[in-house]
Amino acid sequence: MTNSPIRVLLQTTIPSIEDDWNIGRFSMMRDYLASLTNDDGSPLCLVTARDRAEPGRPDPILSTIDRSDFDELWLFAVDTGDGLHPEDCAAVGRFRSNGGGLLVTRDHMDLGSSVCSLGGIGRAHYFHSTNVDPDEANRVIDDRETSYILWPNYHSGANGDFQEIEVVGPPHPVLLDPAAPGGLIRYLPAHPHEGAVGAPVDDQTARVIATGTSKVSGRQFNLAVAFEPSADGGPGIAQSTFHHFADFNWDPAAGCPSFVDETPGTALAQSPEAQQSIRRYVRNVALWLAGREPFEDRKDHLDRQLDEALEESFPASDPPAVDSR
């Protein structure tokens, strides 16, 4: 595996507004990615974190990203519909067509709906007013604590708490964790009103890889959709909410915009296991989006599965080995 650093762009879809979800509110994840190293001690990632330029005109970085040296883009759609210019979308599309990795995340209702204009991974995001969930049964209010937020608004828990996730189908590389029980990532940050994602039915490269469960209704909902790399484009992930990566959700003491009024929890701060799970997910995503599938981790997981299968295959009546000395 090459030791050249992965060039990561973390970008929001709003200008640098202090009392909003600006890029500074994702600093813990930024610093964690920047702290990762290769076996030889060299940086695993070179991270650039920025907000977009003023809306209504092409962003100077996004609109030229296909001509940049970035390996992957993590796009935090925190706008109300005007966060991406057509030239931004076209360049991001070319970037992925050239093999670039792309993570796109948003939040509840229509927050981040500018991603619908991306096509591709943008089509995996369902909103209240545009690109609605094709399953009418999902077009219902879930969280009822914040009455002005309508569907999709899945309540996985309080900000500052964590949720237990369910891995769907064959475990995806981004969900492998050899240090965890079962070799899989089990936790992500919780949020009172997550958005909705789903695999486009006409895209054979896409599948749901993880689900969560509402603490209000008990409904299961999709947390992440993975798009496998193909001749048509690089790897991609559609994530149900940017709160999985926000400082406030990793540590509520980091603060939040003034319009957030739900009482946060403290469970994540008290669970090193959940913290490790979340960091591992971020690391795995960074590697996988850059085409560096964590092969060693996959081998560890397969070896673990083989060991468990061998143990189960031994007859229960076999006596234990005894030292006769």
What are these language model-derived features?
Residues M1-D31, D69-W74, G112-S114, G120, ...:
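Extracellular ligand-binding/catalytic regions of CAZymes and related secreted enzymes
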Residues V104-G218:
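An acidic, glycine-rich "communication" segment
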Residues D107, S240-T241, R325:
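Short, well-ordered beta-to-alpha junction loops that form the rim of enzyme active sites
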